[in-house]
Structures are given as structure tokens and as C-alpha cells.
């Protein structure tokens, strides 16, 4: 396994962790909150974002304008059944979601959730490191690499791992700050 492959895999993990963070509700409206909402559209589970135009007209409102007005009921039902904790307001033209301010208790829960997601990202990075180091040791055992080359590669892999773990910590700190800001 090449160092560039290790870096690519770790970068994908960082991006995945960032996407997970984006689905955590803060006090501000963010259309990413609806990324995981699936709508039963004529018997098919369809992502909400492919059925409607989603905008954030202000900091506390998400507006959902369905391309097909006949799907408003299903969209409303899907939002109610989702775990985002918001109640849709349907005015016949569009669906609005008002984002209430977060309570202190809810902020603490969200910080814990962000920490859990960050830890999952770190575990994924450590698994990538383990696989890469196993690959290097196997190459050394098969005499494809010298002992020194193997040790140097393992040190490089560890440096990259530390770098990407620090990036996840930075993302977590930024998300915690975002959640805690009133």
C-alpha cells in the first residue's frame, strides 16, 4: 500500500466525518439537516433533495418547495418521521421548518454526539493505519523492503495518521464551538 493511497483513504474519512457533522442541528438553519431524509414517493424511497428545492431564506428557517405539489403530504410525513426533531408547516405552496433555539441540555447532547462521530472517524483512520502497516510488514517479510525502508515507511504512516487525527480534532472543536454558540 502506497503512502498516497493511505492519505487518500484518510482524506475520504475526514470528508465523511465532516458530512456527518453537517447533519447535526445547530441553532442555525442548514439544508444539510435534510440530507438523510427519505420520502416514500410513489412507493420508492427517494432523497428529499431530489424531490424539492431546499433553501434557507433566513438563519432560523428552511424552506422546501416541492417540484411536484402532489408530493407535499409525503414530504411532510417523512420530515415528521425523521430524527431531526422539527415540525413542518405546510401552507399549500411550500413547507417551512422553523429552527428553534437550542436548550443548554440539547446543546450538551449534540456536543456528545459530535464527539462520538469524531471518535468513529478516528477509529476509521486507525484502521487504515493498521492495514497500511500490516501491508508494509508483509512486504518486509517477503523481502520486498529492507528493515530500514520498512521502519521509515511505518514512521511516515504514523506521521500521516497523527496529522489526520489532528484534523478530526480541529473539525470537532469547530463543531463544538458552533453548537455552543448561542
UniProtKB/Swiss-Prot annotation:
Matching Pfam families: RRF
Main subcellular location: cytoplasm
InterPro entries, alphabetized: Ribosome_recyc_fac, Ribosome_recyc_fac_dom, RRF_sf
One Gene Ontology CC term in the entry: cytoplasm
GO MF annotation list: ribosomal large subunit binding
SUPFAM superfamilies: Ribosome recycling factor, RRF
Keywords linked to the UniProt accession: Cytoplasm, Protein biosynthesis
GO terms for biological process, alphabetical: translational termination
Cellular compartments annotated: Cytoplasm
Family affiliation: Belongs to the RRF family.
Function comment: Responsible for the release of ribosomes from messenger RNA at the termination of protein biosynthesis. May increase the efficiency of translation by recycling ribosomes from one round of translation to another.
PANTHER family: MITOCHONDRIAL RIBOSOME RECYCLING FACTOR PSEUDO 1, RIBOSOME RECYCLING FACTOR
Protein name as annotated: Ribosome-recycling factor
Amino acid at each position: 500500500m502506497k503512502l498516497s493511497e493511505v492519505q487518500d483513504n484518510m482524506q475520504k474519512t475526514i470528508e465523511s466525518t465532516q458530512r456527518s457533522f453537517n447533519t447535526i442541528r445547530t441553532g442555525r438553519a442548514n439544508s444539510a439537516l435534510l440530507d438523510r431524509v427519505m420520502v416514500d414517493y410513489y412507493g420508492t424511497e427517494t432523497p428529499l433533495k431530489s424531490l424539492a428545492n431546499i433553501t434557507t431564506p433566513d438563519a432560523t428557517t428552511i424552506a422546501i418547495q416541492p417540484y411536484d405539489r402532489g408530493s407535499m403530504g409525503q414530504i411532510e410525513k417523512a420530515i415528521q418521521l425523521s430524527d431531526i426533531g422539527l415540525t413542518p408547516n405546510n401552507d399549500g405552496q411550500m413547507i417551512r421548518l422553523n429552527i428553534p433555539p437550542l436548550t443548554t441540555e440539547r446543546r450538551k447532547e449534540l456536543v456528545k454526539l459530535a464527539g462520538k462521530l469524531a471518535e468513529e472517524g478516528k477509529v476509521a483512520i486507525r484502521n487504515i493505519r493498521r492495514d497500511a502497516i500490516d501491508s508494509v510488514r508483509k512486504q518486509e517479510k517477503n523481502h520486498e523492503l529492507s528493515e530500514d525502508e520498512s521502519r521509515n515507511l511505518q514512521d511516515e504512516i504514523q506521521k500521516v495518521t497523527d496529522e489526520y487525527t489532528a484534523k478530526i480534532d480541529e473539525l470537532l472543536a469547530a463543531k463544538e464551538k458552533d453548537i455552543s454558540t448561542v
